[in-house]
Amino acid sequence: MEKTTDWNALWNDLVEIRSSDRRKRQESGEGKDPWINRAHRFQEGVRERWLQKDSSRDFILSRIDADSTALDIGSGTGAWSLLLSPHVRHVTAVDPSESMLSVLRENLAAENAANVYIVQGAWPDVEVEPHDFSLCSHAMYGYPDLAEFIRGMEKHTRRTCFMLLRATDLNCVQSEAARHLRGHPFDSPNFTIAYNILIQMGIYANVLMENTGYWKPRVSPSLQAALERLKRELCLAGIDEHDEFLLDLLRRRLSRQDGVYVWPSEVCSALVYWESRQ
């Protein structure tokens, strides 16, 4: 009989690989808050992506109403909280990073958004009241037990839960590398794993793929820079035994254009949503 994949355990394994790598960086001087020097840069990246309309934002706005409340889990610098705030009674923004929340406070003051309340802490260990809608946009990747994370969302949601996740092509550069290193195509937590976790929890969620297609392709100035980036993403910094394979992979898959190396466009966003069972 074929063995059934424990998708939550796979998610946990991938999170733990990244957590171990993060602990090493903290010991080498990164600090407990990895966003301390990157929060404003993160915000600029979000703003650049949001210059283009996408179906996820339009769809979520079509589902909420002026008398409802929204919970923004892993709010970061507040792009979603600020988007939702004019359309609901109030928003609660939850995030563990003081660096992110500091930028969020600046943004709330600049927009005079008085109906956004901030709770600092890691989900699902924070104390908040149930809301009509809950949203987590790409902020679940660091939590090892996604099933518990989802149960926390449902517990605090009266109507609809929304999750936005990275959906990677299972033949992308990172997937080919992961097959070689780990025997499966997953380099990190993503939509495919999360959706299978939902199914194993008995949740048959709806999915809306972003209609803008793949994210903007990444660019590396050299093959060596591309190798360093790929190794960083695979948590292989300081480990050289796979370099020959990875360099060959990058030579095959990246294209050289105008003096730089362009990665294939292989990632988009998936909006997953379902009615809370609470």
Task: Give residue spans per PLM region.
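Conserved Class I S-adenosyl-L-methionine
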Residues: N206-Q278
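Short alpha-helix
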Residues: D187-G202, N206
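A short glycine-rich, Lys/Arg-flanked "PGG" loop and its adjoining helix->strand segment in the class I
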Residues: A147-F162
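Conserved class I S-adenosyl-L-methionine
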Residues: M1-I64, T160-D187
